[in-house]
Amino acid sequence: MSINLNRVQNLIEKLAFISSVPNELTRLAFTEEDEKAHNMIIELCKEYDLSIRRDSIGNLFIRKAGKEDFLPAVAFGSHIDTVVNAGKFDGPLGSVAGLEILLQLCEQNIQTRYPLELIIFTCEESSRFNFATLGSKVMCGIVNQEKLSSLRDKQGKGLSEAMAEVGMNFNLVNQAKRDAKEFKCFFELHIEQGPRLENEGKTIGVVTGIAAPIRAIVKIKGQADHSGATAMHYRHDALLGGSELSLAIERAAIQAGHSTVATVGNITAKPGVMNVVPGYCELLVDIRGTHVQARDSVFELLQEEISKVSEKRGLLIELQLISKDNPIILPENMVNQIAETAHSLGYSYEIMPSGAGHDAMHMATLCPTGMIFIPSHLGISHNPLEFTDWKDIEAGIKVLQKVILEQAEVC
């Protein structure tokens, strides 16, 4: 079965122009621009024999009926929301690839025994609410309305208000939960977002497991004082306390090993002026790994360092846990299917873990799940310089297409 690469490229480019900020790609979840992107895909699908549905959290389902439509669906997908000042491939690649496969099946009148379901998950990125993979977590029953009620964006807007602004009802969120018996399996195609495939000269990454993050906010209260009149030994500098903790987090991740990584992605200091000792500081902390004990050791060390820094500098420090996801090991049969498919199509491949989190990690709690990577040039992602060669995109779609059709059984 062929692939219309021009259509794929055109759709990815069109999505890249839907942004809330001129001259860059920023499309956060539950915004007017996010809805515009979803509606563009919906309008295209209306031209084909596909059923279209959005659930109460905003996940989009595009379904092609199977010959035995009562059977569980072979599902696949990704997301289309972005980080701030994003690249154009993270998320849209897997979503558009899945859409292209459905459109080709419709155009070529190919029927499968099992139904096919493309899922475009809402709010995969943590950029708006500091809470990642929101749509898949709700759909898979990992979080519910009560857990989400405390989420706020940087403007202080709650998730319920953000949803209402785009016509969704937060009180219906729990209705989005799906049952495991509805799915035969799930696949996600994604850019690697790291340099390994390019460095190794491989076209396809066969993912064995997905690292999961611990995310937390550290809130540090000190004493705002005059920068000239307050002697150094009288200060309770919240920013310096935050700086100490940031460096401690870095050291802990290095010591933990097992490819554990930790990031302080943002430091906010208040009042944020030159002539005042900072009286308040806030850190956004992201700790990831596939090795649970190693990852958790970084968080434990952070807690220990908080006690030390608090006492040393006379600070009040609160550690607020936002989320703690579990790393996922993907089923061997799904890994083998993807590897064998890549080999059969003549593509070189690398067996590898995913350092980034993905919606696939939550789908893996519902059904057998596989994940396919293609190279990211220089390993760059979450950046306008993010790039993947179109020939690699074509290869990834062909591998995805073949594993889907094997699972769905062409009639």
UniProtKB/Swiss-Prot annotation:
The keyword Hydrolase applies. It comes from the Bacteria. Its EC number is 3.-.-.-. Pfam families: M20_dimer, Peptidase_M20. Keywords: Hydrolase. One of its GO terms (molecular function) is hydrolase activity, acting on carbon-nitrogen (but not peptide) bonds, in linear amidines. Disulfide bonds: none annotated. Belongs to the peptidase M20 family. This is Uncharacterized hydrolase HI_0588. It comes from Haemophilus influenzae (strain ATCC 51907 / DSM 11121 / KW20 / Rd).
